């Protein structure tokens, strides 16, 4: 199996590559580092937090989380739903883009916030593969003509029960992976506050739902 992306490969191919994230980023002229990031969290009231967290906690004992579909429907979907309610942000699911022959494919959750953001689902609990996929997706957004001018792009990779965040600094071409792992449902509130803060500024929040 080739250890690099070939023409006509898609984002899902980067998921399967067994190479270090640093090497993958360098193929496209970017640097990659992992460190503990102090990501800002929205500090205001989010009035669905307790209700949604309790619902997830209530149904989990009755679910078998042995399929990716189940995790997406019962762990990821409630977060996406609440994000829409809080922010009125347009979120496209399974969104297809093509930037070049080596940067193309499906983005699981494409968020049209003022600074485009993405959420990548890691199949089979494979966070390393999900990180590689997120790297190529962030690079694709950085090079995409439709991406608004901004200093950085925000991304997340999730298995459903575990979330990990990343940033692409556009001027320096540096991709940072947060070493902190957030678990749902225990860290549900932290995940929501990081996502809300990343997507919109406070004056753009849908105040009827906070």
What are these model-predicted stretches?
Residues 155, 159:
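Phosphate/pyrophosphate-binding active-site loops
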Residues 2, 11-154, 164-210:
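A short, conserved, highly charged catalytic patch centered on acidic carboxylates
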């Amino acid at each position: 199996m080739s250890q690099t992306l070939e023409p006509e490969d898609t984002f899902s191919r980067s998921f399967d590559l067994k190479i270090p994230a640093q090497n993958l980023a360098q193929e496209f002229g970017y640097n990659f580092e992992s460190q503990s990031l102090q990501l800002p969290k929205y500090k205001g009231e989010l009035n669905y937090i307790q209700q949604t967290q309790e619902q997830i906690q209530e149904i989990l004992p009755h679910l078998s989380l042995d399929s990716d579909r189940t995790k997406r429907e019962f762990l990821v979907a409630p977060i996406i739903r609440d994000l829409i309610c809080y922010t009125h942000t347009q979120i496209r699911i399974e969104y297809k883009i093509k930037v070049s022959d080596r940067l193309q494919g499906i983005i699981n959750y494409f968020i049209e916030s003022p600074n485009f953001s993405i959420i990548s689902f890691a199949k089979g609990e494979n966070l390393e593969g999900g990180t590689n996929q997120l790297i190529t997706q962030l690079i694709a957004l950085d090079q995409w003509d439709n991406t608004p001018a901004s200093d950085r792009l925000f991304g997340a990779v999730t298995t459903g029960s575990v979330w990990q965040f990343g940033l692409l600094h556009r001027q320096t071409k540096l991709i940072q992976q947060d070493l902190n792992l957030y678990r749902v449902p225990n860290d549900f509130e932290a995940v929501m506050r990081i996502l809300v803060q990343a997507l919109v500024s406070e004056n753009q929040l849908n105040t009827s739902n906070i």
